[in-house]
């Protein structure tokens, strides 16, 4: 923990906690170079950005969407940014950044180098959006039991959609339900070993034995390693849904896709217990629906 830091905000003997509505103003005032965020807050940032762009009229909105599309194709997954003929798009992207994206960044203080996303799986579409406007949002992975960083992306080496590359002096393997090591690209439980892994749970020998085996920490998370050395975390290994043909899949990514693709869905939850079909419980975004109905009735 030689490079770690702990920061607390204390005022008049009390710990301060900000409300969400004040966060945008605080960011603009402080002008941070690094911002740590959870996906829910980042999604709220994106909604506000798109809302402000839409309010400027159809011409600006169309120009912004074209700039996003161009930036997406240029950036790709980050690791292959601007490769080959994509480099020809750079002059136009520079112009778009000057007249559009830089103005958005000013709303965040104008100095942010990148976001760090944590607390939950970060949707790749959200990463592409912030990457396009010049404020990359990188995902990492860690556990308290691993003190806590296991992997992370960095400005000089990153791949959108991944949880990054492993920290130094850490071993990782992907295993099946029986503890057998799987090859690169195969999905299984993420298991790690290294000096940063805990000795055990305080006064809980039973939990320690089930989590630590021969020095290996069984995280309970499902994922895989790709051929470029990046880790992909897919969800909790024990929360997998099972269809009637025995296929197992993680619900988190599908649930994220539902809420990301429709502005009228607030939350959703998938369920399947060895049935031939999967059901989903959807909670509508009443405010968004009412707003759309008012627009249609005008």
Question: Predicted segments — roles?
Answer:
Residues 112, 167-170, 265:
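Core-facing hydrophobic residues within beta-strands of well-ordered domains
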Residues 13-52:
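P-loop NTPase motor core
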Residues 166, 173-175, 180-185, 191-243:
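Conserved ATP-binding/catalytic segment of the ANL
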Residues 8-10, 115-117, 242-243:
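Short catalytic-loop micro-motif centered on adjacent basic/acidic residues
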Residues 5, 33-36, 47-158, 263:
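Gly/Ser/Thr-rich phosphate-binding loop
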Residues 40, 120-121, 196, 287:
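Alpha-helix/helix-capping structural signal
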Residues 194, 199-200, 222-298:
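AMP-binding/adenylate-forming catalytic core of the ANL superfamily
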Residues 5-29, 58-59, 249-254:
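ATP-dependent adenylate-forming carboxylate-activation enzymes
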């Amino acid at each position: 923990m030689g490079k770690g830091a702990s920061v607390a905000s204390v005022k008049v003997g009390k710990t301060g906690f900000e409300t969400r509505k004040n966060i945008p103003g605080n960011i603009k005032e402080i002008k941070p170079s690094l911002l740590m965020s959870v996906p829910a807050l980042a999604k709220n940032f994106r909604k506000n950005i798109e809302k402000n762009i839409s309010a400027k009229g159809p011409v600006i909105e169309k120009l912004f969407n074209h700039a996003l599309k161009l930036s997406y194709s240029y950036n790709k997954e980050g690791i292959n940014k601007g490769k080959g003929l994509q480099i020809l798009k750079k002059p136009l992207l520079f112009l778009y950044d000057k007249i559009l994206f830089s103005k958005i960044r000013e709303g965040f203080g104008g100095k942010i180098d990148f976001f760090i996303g944590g607390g939950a799986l970060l949707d790749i579409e959200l990463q592409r959006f912030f990457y396009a406007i010049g404020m990359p949002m990188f995902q990492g992975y860690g556990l308290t039991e691993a003190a806590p960083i296991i992997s992370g992306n960095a400005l000089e080496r990153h791949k959108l959609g991944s949880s990054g590359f492993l920290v130094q002096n850490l071993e990782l393997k992907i295993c099946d339900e029986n503890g057998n090591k799987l090859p690169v690209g195969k999905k299984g439980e993420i298991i790690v070993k290294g000096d940063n892994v805990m000795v055990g749970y305080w006064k809980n020998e039973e939990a320690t034995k089930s989590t630590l085996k021969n020095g290996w920490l069984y995280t309970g998370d499902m994922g895989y390693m790709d051929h470029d050395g990046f880790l992909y975390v897919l969800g909790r290994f024990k929360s997998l849904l099972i269809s009637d043909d025995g296929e197992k899949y993680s619900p988190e990514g599908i649930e994220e896709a539902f809420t990301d693709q429709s502005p009228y869905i607030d939350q959703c939850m998938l369920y399947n217990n060895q049935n031939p079909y999967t059901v989903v419980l959807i909670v509508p975004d009443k405010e968004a629906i009412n707003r759309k109905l008012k627009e249609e009735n005008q």
